[in-house]
Amino acid sequence: NSIIGQQISTKAHKTIWKKMVTVLGEITPQVIDSLSDEELQQFGITFKKAAYIKSAAQKVLSGELDIESLRTMSDEEVCTKLVELDGIGIWTAEMLMLFSMLRRNILSFGDLALVRGMRMVYHHKVINRQLFDRYKKRFSPYASVASLYFWAVAGGAIEGMKDYTSTNNKYDETVSYTHLTL
């Protein structure tokens, strides 16, 4: 699911996933392995993503990737293990930990919308790694909850909040905002 969502809109991701669940039922490594790359592509998945998804399913089936062992690992260990898979980078590993494994302390520096929400809440033009890590420490061990709030803010959940990154657009509006403290 997380590989499918890479670099596409949330709407497109949900559409593809819904189509897969409707046609295939429960999505398991066995189900994925039974499909050809071309069959996966018919759901709207790119050739590369189809190959990555098939490869991950095959590694689970062969025992090369033991899903159960991930449950006892630290977030850092899980991330390291997941990025060994083709097509899985840090952002995808973090999204898997957050949404599939329900890890409580995930705040992704690589997620543009999340960082945008953070800029909006704290009125920064830029959030560098050092500042991001300071905020993450503030939210630990429940940074995943902060992720959900920052995404909501970036998506417009709080009327009047603005992004402080300069776009150099003469049509940018200056609006009042409500300060949100998490």
Model regions: which residues?
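Short alpha-helical scaffolding segments that buttress acidic/His motifs in well-ordered protein cores
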Residues: 3-4, 53-57, 96, 146-150
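Catalytic DNA-binding helix-loop module of base-excision-repair DNA glycosylases/AP lyases
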Residues: 4, 74-119
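Alpha-helical ds-nucleic-acid-binding substructure associated with the helix-hairpin-helix region
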Residues: 8-9, 13-86, 138-140
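Long, compositionally biased
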Residues: 63-66, 80-81, 121, 163-173
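Short, charged, surface-exposed loops that flank catalytic or proteolytic processing sites
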Residues: 124-129
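Long hydrophobic alpha-helical segments typical of transmembrane helices together
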Residues: 133-176
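Conserved small/polar residues in nucleotide/adenosyl-binding loops
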Residues: 178-182
